[in-house]
Amino acid sequence: MERTYLMIKPDGVQRGLVGEIISRFEKKGFKLVGMKFLRLTREMAEKHYAEHVGKPFFAGLVDYIISGPVVAMCWEGKDIVSVSREMMGATNPAKAAPGTIRGTYAVDIGRNIIHGSDSPASAERELAIYFQSDELVEWDRTLQGWLTE
């Protein structure tokens, strides 16, 4: 099964959306295998957003993501990287489809509730920033046979 990294950003935590967001992924049939509630260090944030170093918004992005607690999660499921991206909606909430997480809850591109890995390679890199291998729990979901062939 494929894994991805999802992070509820400080605005999602402050607005009390953690339960709602987790519920959406559980109801879709995805399996939570790791979760942490933490405040990112500047070093973690800079490592996470390394691809944006040198861009005009980099400093503000790092300052924002370390401004409050986040929920770091590892989810598992069939095609989870692409499906979770669809569930989140476009990065810019103004372009996010109604019913997506960002289309429903986000207002501003700089406060867009959630981050999700954009590829399996990104997921692997991002998960390594937040989780040790022994922090991801292998478990059998009894209803898995009802979700996928």
Curated annotation (Swiss-Prot):
One of its GO terms (biological process) is CTP biosynthetic process. CDD domains: NDPk_I. Keywords: ATP-binding, Cytoplasm, Kinase, Magnesium, Metal-binding, Nucleotide metabolism, Nucleotide-binding, Phosphoprotein, Transferase. It catalyses: a 2'-deoxyribonucleoside 5'-diphosphate + ATP = a 2'-deoxyribonucleoside 5'-triphosphate + ADP; a ribonucleoside 5'-diphosphate + ATP = a ribonucleoside 5'-triphosphate + ADP. The active site is at H115. It is an enzyme of class 2 (transferase). GO terms for molecular function: ATP binding; metal ion binding; nucleoside diphosphate kinase activity. ATP binds at K9, F57, R85, T91, R102, N112. It comes from the Bacteria. Transmembrane segments: none annotated. Its EC number is 2.7.4.6. InterPro entries: NDK-like_dom, NDK-like_dom_sf, Nucleoside_diP_kinase, Nucleoside_diP_kinase_AS. SUPFAM superfamilies: Nucleoside diphosphate kinase, NDK. Its main location: cytoplasm. GO terms for cellular component: cytoplasm. Its cofactor is Mg(2+). It is found in: Cytoplasm. The keyword Oxidoreductase does not apply. Major role in the synthesis of nucleoside triphosphates other than ATP. The ATP gamma phosphate is transferred to the NDP beta phosphate via a ping-pong mechanism, using a phosphorylated active-site intermediate. Belongs to the NDK family. This is Nucleoside diphosphate kinase. It comes from Heliobacterium modesticaldum (strain ATCC 51547 / Ice1). The gene is ndk.
